[in-house]
């Protein structure tokens, strides 16, 4: 499941839609001077764009650690959610932005947050995309290796589906177990148990 499909598309294209506010555009661009100016002029850090994304999530997904740090220093709610209920930590983990992930965790972001439509933890997104360094960091921060999302899938299942075997191996070393064959599919189960 591509949990940030609209936002990822805007990052790839390079511009946010016309209805995105200037703070959201500056966050996407990583324009720290413009972000500072807009905040000094009273821009609202809790405002969502019309796609339902707060500027903190956009900056986290884009990997702009300096913008994320500025938002947090200016009082951004670290647990602000997009319309799907995902946080900045979900976004940074999904995108593989390790520096941003570290900052968010250091500031108190919940590594086991699953209070979203998908019931996914940040570890699910990092594992799905094969971001092994992010997975390793989240595990050291006590992320639940056996957390299940709304369909019952674990981070290991998601890493295996995408054939991210280095990530899957790391998850297994951290205690993840292969799920039943009928849940994950026979080929994945065979590969998983062979590598365990």
Predicted regions and their residues:
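Terminal, low-structured helical/coil segments at or just beyond the last alpha-helical repeat
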Residues: 177-196
């Amino acid at each position: 499941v591509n949990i940030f499909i609209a936002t990822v598309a805007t990052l790839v294209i390079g511009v946010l839609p016309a209805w995105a506010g200037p703070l959201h555009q500056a966050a996407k661009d990583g324009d720290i001077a413009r972000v500072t100016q807009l905040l000094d002029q009273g821009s609202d850090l809790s405002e969502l764009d019309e796609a339902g994304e707060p500027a903190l999530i956009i900056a986290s997904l884009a990997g702009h650690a300096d913008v994320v740090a500025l938002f947090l220093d200016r009082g951004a709610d670290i647990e602000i959610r997009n319309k799907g209920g995902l946080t900045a930590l979900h976004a940074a983990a999904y995108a593989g932005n390790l520096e941003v992930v570290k900052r968010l965790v250091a500031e108190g972001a919940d590594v086991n947050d699953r209070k979203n439509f998908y019931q996914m933890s940040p570890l699910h997104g990092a594992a799905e995309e094969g971001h092994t360094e992010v997975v390793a960091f989240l595990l050291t921060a006590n992320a639940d290796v056996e957390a299940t999302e709304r369909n019952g899938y674990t981070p290991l299942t998601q890493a295996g589906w995408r054939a991210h075997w280095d990530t899957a191996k790391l998850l297994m070393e951290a205690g993840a177990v292969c799920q039943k064959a009928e849940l994950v599919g026979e080929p994945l189960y065979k590969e998983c148990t062979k590598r365990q």
